[in-house]
Amino acid sequence: EPDADPGRDLLSMAIINAALERRIPIFAICRGLQELVVATGGSLHRKLCEQPELLEHREDPELPVEQQYAPSHEVQVEEGGLLSALLPECSNFWVNSLHGQGAKVVSPRLRVEARSPDGLVEAVSVINHPFALGVQWHPEWNSSEYALSRILFEGFITACQHHIAEKQRL
């Protein structure tokens, strides 16, 4: 595949597994979610566009960047997970969608946190980890304008602060 980068993939898997083993907080975005799925034993749809039951999740490169990163579909949050704890008053919200691959099989080590209307996994967390969250969308885009994105980043920052404080106590 033209976009394949085996060296990057190996490095990503090593970093993810080291962070999981050391219980270091992870906030995996877009490809990061896909790498988290694979690192924990899951698999991917290599080309979502070849799955007729799924929505179009790729961006249109002909559009201005602002439109490419604009919200394009809703996600439904699963109850009882990390995402619902971070967003207790929010069971569904709109996200942008700029990916050609997506989770096919999710490892038993992961918990599905959110899905798009077509059933595709849009967010996962690692079970029994203080904060290892992967999202398929790009919350970093215009995050200063979206309270939901800020809440996710603040949750990650808080988890990092707790991790550092815990290490200092040891």
Regions found by a protein language model. Name each.
Residues C30:
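Conserved G/P- and acidic residue-centered "switch" motifs that form tight phosphate/ATP-binding loops
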Residues V135-L170:
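Acyltransferase
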Residues V37:
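Structured adenosyl-cofactor binding patch, chiefly the S-adenosyl-L-methionine
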Residues D3, G41-E122, T158-A159:
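Pocket-forming structural segment of enzyme catalytic cores
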Residues R109, I127-A132:
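Beta-strand-turn-beta hairpins that frame and shape the catalytic cleft
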Residues E1-F27, T40-G41, H45, C49-E53, ...:
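Flexible gly/pro-rich beta->alpha loop and the following alpha-helix that scaffold active-site loops
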